[in-house]
């Protein structure tokens, strides 16, 4: 397969992934499409064509698996403790983790004497 065919395929994957990720949000969908189009028309000169294609495929994969949009449900809808209610756009391709990495991070923080990431105190994670 030629480089131009692979690039076109990656671009199409990106557009499909954006359509899934931003379903119902025309503003974000149009912004994502514009950004992808700009990247195809004026590619980063520091990257090879193969790297650019790989980057577009990675972006498409990230949009499909890791991006979940939330939409606030009516202003008057709240939980019993007064918090707002949101509806999440979780679809068949959304990657649902098991939170083991979050649990491991808390253990690591304790092992480091409570020092948070980036040298912070970790106070935000204690709440």
Swiss-Prot record:
Feature: transit peptide: 1-15
Subcellular location: Mitochondrion matrix
Gene Ontology cellular component annotations, sorted alphabetically: mitochondrial matrix
InterPro entries reported in the protein's UniProt record: Complex1_LYR_LYRM7, MZM1/LYRM7
Biological process (GO), any one: mitochondrial respiratory chain complex III assembly
Sorted UniProt keywords: Chaperone, Mitochondrion, Transit peptide
Superkingdom classification of source: Eukaryota
Single GO molecular function: protein folding chaperone
Function field: Assembly factor required for Rieske Fe-S protein RIP1 incorporation into the cytochrome b-c1 (CIII) complex. Functions as a chaperone, binding to this subunit within the mitochondrial matrix and stabilizing it prior to its translocation and insertion into the late CIII dimeric intermediate within the mitochondrial inner membrane. Modulates the mitochondrial matrix zinc pool.
Family statement drawn from the similarity comment of this UniProt entry: Belongs to the complex I LYR family. MZM1 subfamily.
Subunit composition and interactions: Interacts with RIP1.
Protein name, per record: Mitochondrial zinc maintenance protein 1, mitochondrial
Organism of provenance: Vanderwaltozyma polyspora (strain ATCC 22028 / DSM 70294 / BCRC 21397 / CBS 2163 / NBRC 10782 / NRRL Y-8283 / UCD 57-17) (Kluyveromyces polysporus)
Lineage of origin: Eukaryota, Fungi, Dikarya, Ascomycota, Saccharomycotina
Gene designation per UniProt: MZM1
């Amino acid at each position: 397969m030629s480089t131009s065919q692979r690039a076109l395929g990656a671009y199409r994957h990106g557009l499909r992934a954006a359509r899934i990720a931003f379903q119902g949000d025309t503003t974000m969908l149009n912004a994502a499409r514009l950004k992808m189009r700009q990247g195809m028309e004026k590619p980063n000169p520091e990257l090879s064509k193969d790297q650019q294609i790989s980057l577009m495929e990675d972006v498409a994969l990230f949009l499909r698996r890791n991006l979940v949009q939330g939409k606030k449900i009516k202003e008057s809808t709240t939980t019993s403790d007064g918090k707002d209610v949101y509806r999440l756009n979780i679809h068949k391709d959304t990657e649902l983790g098991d939170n083991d990495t979050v649990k491991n991070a808390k253990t690591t923080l304790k092992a480091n004497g409570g020092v948070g990431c980036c040298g912070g105190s970790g106070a935000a994670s204690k709440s």
